[in-house]
Curated annotation (Swiss-Prot):
Protein name: Ferrochelatase
Catalytic reaction equation(s): heme b + 2 H(+) = protoporphyrin IX + Fe(2+)
Role this protein plays: Catalyzes the ferrous insertion into protoporphyrin IX.
Pfam families: Ferrochelatase (PF00762)
Domain of life assignment: Bacteria
GO cellular component: a single term: cytoplasm
Gene (UniProt): hemH
Positions with a binding annotation for Fe cation: H194, E275
Species lineage: Bacteria, Pseudomonadati, Pseudomonadota, Gammaproteobacteria, Enterobacterales
Family to which this protein belongs: Belongs to the ferrochelatase family.
Pathway: Porphyrin-containing compound metabolism; protoheme biosynthesis; protoheme from protoporphyrin-IX: step 1/1
Key words, A-Z: Cytoplasm, Heme biosynthesis, Iron, Lyase, Metal-binding, Porphyrin biosynthesis
């Protein structure tokens, strides 16, 4: 039975099914085989991936996932699932599905459920506020490939990103303001975005511009001057230069400059995950405190907050 003529597809990166070495190896193999993510020629990359990266990285990453795993499962999936359910409650006349680019729930299964319901319009919303070919571009590639097998296609609206959308900036502003009110204002607010290789930017990826757009808009909304707010890039991987300044190196240098109390927000993550809960909240906190910092606080992602669901609802309405 057809529930709706409108289908909404929320897409996030993905997560292992369990905090175990085999599950993480399966997940990393799929993720790191995406040519949008790693564009090294396969003849060079695949031996490294299978012979070095997967055997050694999977064991290390398993321990990290174990430290953040929630009773309900992986934080990214838990929060993304809550987002899907909350948005579906806001849009009773639409069919709302959640999919992950890598792992479960799969894009193919989610799209099939929507198509078989007879939808005539599909809104695709990658949950990445700032466009990058490595994220939003990869979603487009995967969705396009999946849709090839269907003879009848719905009208498709693809939301490229929402780096400056007023509701997104307002949601971040409200989150930070509440944190300031409860914990006090820090010496500096640091916005940490996921990095990408600098080479990808030279090839045309406008990701850093979109991060800067968010940074400027949020700085203005909060009324913070440059001496009170800054932006950095985290999660570098591999041997080539990534976007700078690096989050970890910046945090290590700040105490010597008199910055003793830092609060970190990761605006590029729509839901808390390994990169925020472990890399930032644990690893980078330790770096800052060991360098002489006195107080490190992490401001949670928007997750399934009312402001986040307001934002998702408004983004869907654009289609």
């Amino acid at each position: 039975m057809v529930k709706s003529k409108l289908g909404v597809l929320l897409v996030n990166l993905g997560t292992p099914d369990a905090p175990t070495v085999p599950a993480i190896k399966r997940y990393l193999k799929q993720f790191l085989s995406d040519r949008r993510v790693i564009d090294t020629p396969p003849i060079l990359w695949w031996p490294l991936l299978r012979g070095i990266v997967l055997p050694f990285r999977s064991r290390r990453v398993a321990k990290l996932y174990q430290s953040i795993w929630m009773p309900e499962g992986s934080p990214l999936l838990v929060y993304s699932d809550r987002q899907q359910k909350a948005l579906a409650a806001r849009l009773p006349d639409a069919s709302v599905e959640l999919a992950m680019s890598y792992g479960s729930p799969s894009l193919g299964d989610a799209i099939n459920r929507l198509i078989t319901q007879g939808i005539i319009k599909l809104v695709i919303l990658p949950l990445y506020p700032q466009y990058s070919a490595t994220t939003c571009g990869s979603v487009w590639d995967a969705v396009s490939g999946i849709l090839k097998k269907y003879r009848s296609l719905p009208s498709i609206y693809f939301i490229r990103d929402y780096a400056q959308h007023p509701s997104y900036i307002n949601a971040l502003k409200q989150s930070v303001a509440r944190y300031f009110e409860k914990h006090g204002q820090p010496d500096k607010l640091l916005l940490s975005f996921h990095g990408i290789p600098q080479r990808y930017v030279r090839l045309g990826d406008d990701y850093p511009k979109r991060c800067e757009d968010t940074y400027r808009a949020l700085s203005t909304a909060l009324g913070l001057h440059n001496n009170k707010i800054m932006m950095t890039y985290q999660s570098r991987f591999g041997w080539e230069p990534w976007l700078t300044p690096y989050t970890d190196k910046t945090l290590k240098s700040l105490p010597a400059k008199g910055i003793k109390h830092i609060q970190v927000l990761c605006p590029g993550f729509s839901a808390d995950c390994l990169e925020t809960l472990e890399e930032i909240k644990e690893q980078n906190k330790e770096i800052f405190l060991k360098a002489g910092g006195k107080k490190f606080e992490y401001i949670p992602a928007l997750n399934d907050s009312p402001e986040q669901i307001d934002l998702l609802e408004q983004l869907v309405s654009l289609g």
